[in-house]
Amino acid sequence: MSLDNTWFTEIHQDTAFSLRMKEKLHEEQTPFQKIEIYETEGFGTLMVIDGCVMLTDRDNFIYHEMMSHPVLYSHSDPKNVLIIGGGDCGTLREVLKHPEVKSATQVDIDERVTRLAEKYFPELCDSNDDPRAKLLFDDGIKYVQDAAPGSLDVIIIDSTDPVGPAEGLFSTAFYRDCIKALGPGGLLVQQSESPLLHTDSIIKPMHDSLRAAGFLDTLALHFPQCSYPSGWWTATMACKDMPVTFLREAQAEDKPFETHYYNAAIQRAAIACPEFFRKKLYG
């Protein structure tokens, strides 16, 4: 079956993912990237950046919850959180569900992502006015370089793929700066693409770079994300000075807020490592 121009299609490494469109709502070229917004038949509103699906109404909750709750429940007392990227503000919303968080700073280089999210994905921006939230539109790499040593408990890197503006967020030099900015027991989590498509090209080099930078331990979280290439995604957690563990498992069992995907059992399951993946990462 061939698809006509009523479909949006993302082509990635000899695979394709398509959604039938109702209409294109917006398109613009910012100084950093091309952003498109569509209304689809089955997945609600869709945001596309440089031809790649960033989020849809239907499944963004999985990604945002897995980028925030596992790492926060793996830290003993996550008061100060930095989000790099995350311009759609969904991860920020999830972070601010945690009463322990006293400060959540989001640094995204492209303000237009946030302004378009406010218009087309307003439910993701519910917490933008929370007094604990601070939204900055700047270079996240430089922000980390300038951060006071030991000032952060958790760094969440909610970036696009490792090309263009996000490429430097996957470098050993950047990870060294993250270690400096993190306090004792400090944790980093970063979206790390698909195990089926990117283990050799992205995930293994990322884990190697994190350890080369000085992180003591790394751990991959696995979760479904059907609108992303292969439908199977990961987030990589790293701790600067101790093993990555589910430190506050009891609190996660009795979390004081609503989620749609995440719970303590999901976190326990997400760290299970498929055999092919384990062999490639750890030999």
Curated annotation (Swiss-Prot):
Pfam families: Spermine_synt_N, Spermine_synth
Localisation per UniProt entry: Cytoplasm
Functional pathway: Amine and polyamine biosynthesis; spermidine biosynthesis; spermidine from putrescine: step 1/1
Catalytic activity of the protein: S-adenosyl 3-(methylsulfanyl)propylamine + putrescine = S-methyl-5'-thioadenosine + spermidine + H(+)
Positions that bind spermidine: 64, 88, 158-161
Keywords: Cytoplasm, Polyamine biosynthesis, Spermidine biosynthesis, Transferase
InterPro entries from the UniProt entry: PABS (IPR030374), PABS_CS (IPR030373), SAM-dependent_MTases_sf (IPR029063), Spermi_synthase (IPR001045), Spermidine_synt_N (IPR035246), Spermidine_synt_N_sf (IPR037163)
List of catalytic residues: 158 (proton acceptor)
GO cellular component terms given for this protein: cytosol
Alphabetical list of CDD domains matching this protein: AdoMet_MTases
SUPFAM superfamilies for this protein: S-adenosyl-L-methionine-dependent methyltransferases
Domain PABS: 5-240
A Gene Ontology biological process term: spermidine biosynthetic process
Example GO molecular function: spermidine synthase activity
Top-level taxonomic group: Bacteria
Its EC number(s): 2.5.1.16
Binding site for S-methyl-5'-thioadenosine: 33, 108, 139-140, 165
Assembly: Homodimer or homotetramer.
Function in brief: Catalyzes the irreversible transfer of a propylamine group from the amino donor S-adenosylmethioninamine (decarboxy-AdoMet) to putrescine (1,4-diaminobutane) to yield spermidine.
UniProt family annotation: Belongs to the spermidine/spermine synthase family.
NCBIfam families: PRK00811.1, speE
Protein name: Polyamine aminopropyltransferase
Naturally occurring in which organism (per UniProt): Thioalkalivibrio sulfidiphilus (strain HL-EbGR7)
